[in-house]
A protein has these predicted regions:
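Tandem CBS (Cystathionine beta-synthase) repeat/Bateman regulatory domains
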Residues: 1-303
């Protein structure tokens, strides 16, 4: 483990050790540029990850996300087998990275995630060799420890929430995600109360489970007529978490990390759905709070 991989937090009042915060995961899960989509899917499933780095001579060549694969499977009409499709056909060639010697690591990563609207930053050594990856989960985990009591959920949540009812079909839910360009969909009961959360990964796992014998991209992704008719509640595998408007954003971040979820619905005092807070919102909060802290520190040093 690199000595740069963790940040030691000390209590400001006593100077005593408080907690070690992971700056990035290492080694980064990767495949060579001659890989196929089938291999990428397998890597994601085996390692429970949403991003795979594509390398050439151990240096970043491109990056593939869960969203990239979902969009490709929806759009590809060639009827090719998954082991016939090269990863270079779907990967993004622009890889955003910083070196493992970078000062202010978490802030640098959160700022880049915000600017480029991405979910991960690749960490390299001074020679450009990939060493690790910092994800929104890492930033969210750090925020839960570093900024307790600093922000409220209501200040960073998204108020425009896209929903579907649990009785709606699987196909309808998928269409809602695609139409609105979102990563997750809140599922409600007939009264509009949140009962679950569906993500792109939910559909990937479902497609994999029902199409084990098929290797065609078209068959892998497109459900049969019977599957289309199934209600979305069939894919809900856990009770939904909820947050209140006045909850501490750091506690919300801790809940996301602990429960392996990327977003949590927000309700008001009448238990009505009023928004959703996601890891992306936490990343935004981190970048703002950290930047403000640095500005304040510089002000103190000059006045």
């Amino acid at each position: 483990m690199s000595e740069n991989q963790n940040l030691i937090l000390n209590r400001k009042d006593t100077g005593r050790y408080l907690m070690k915060i992971k700056l990035y995961s290492a080694p980064v899960i990767s495949l060579k540029e001659n890989a196929i989509i089938d291999s990428v899917l397998l890597k994601m499933q085996l390692n429970n990850i949403r991003t795979v780095l594509i390398t050439s001579e151990k240096k970043p060549r491109g990056i593939v996300t869960e969203t990239d694969i979902v969009k490709f499977l929806e759009d590809d009409k060639t009827n090719r087998a998954l082991d016939e499709i090269p990863v270079t056909e779907i990967m993004k060639e622009k890889v955003i990275s910083i070196t493992d010697e970078q000062q202010d690591h978490l802030n640098q990563c959160s700022q880049r995630m915000e600017i480029f609207k991405i979910g991960s930053i690749i960490i390299t050594d001074e020679d450009g060799v990939a060493r690790g990856i910092t994800t929104k989960t890492d930033i969210t985990s750090a925020f839960s420890v570093m900024y307790q009591g600093k922000c409220k959920v209501k200040d960073y949540m998204s108020k425009n929430v896209v929903t579907c009812r649990k009785s709606d079909s699987i196909q309808y839910a998928l269409n809602m995600i695609n139409k609105n360009g979102i990563s997750r969909l809140i599922v409600t009961d007939q009264f509009g109360n949140p009962t679950g959360l569906i993500t792109r990964n939910t559909f990937l796992r479902y497609a994999n489970n029902i199409k084990k014998s098929s290797k065609k991209a078209l068959d892998y992704w497109n459900p049969t007529d019977l599957d289309i008719a199934l209600p979305i509640e069939k894919l809900l595998d856990q009770d939904v978490l909820v947050l209140n408007l006045e909850d501490d954003l750091a506690e919300a971040a801790k809940l996301m990390v602990k429960n392996l979820v990327g977003g949590i619905p927000v309700i008001n005092n009448e238990r009505k759905l009023v928004g959703i807070v996601t890891k992306s919102d936490v990343v935004r909060a981190f970048s703002e709070v950290e930047s403000n802290s640095q500005l304040l520190e510089k002000y103190k040093q000059t006045h």
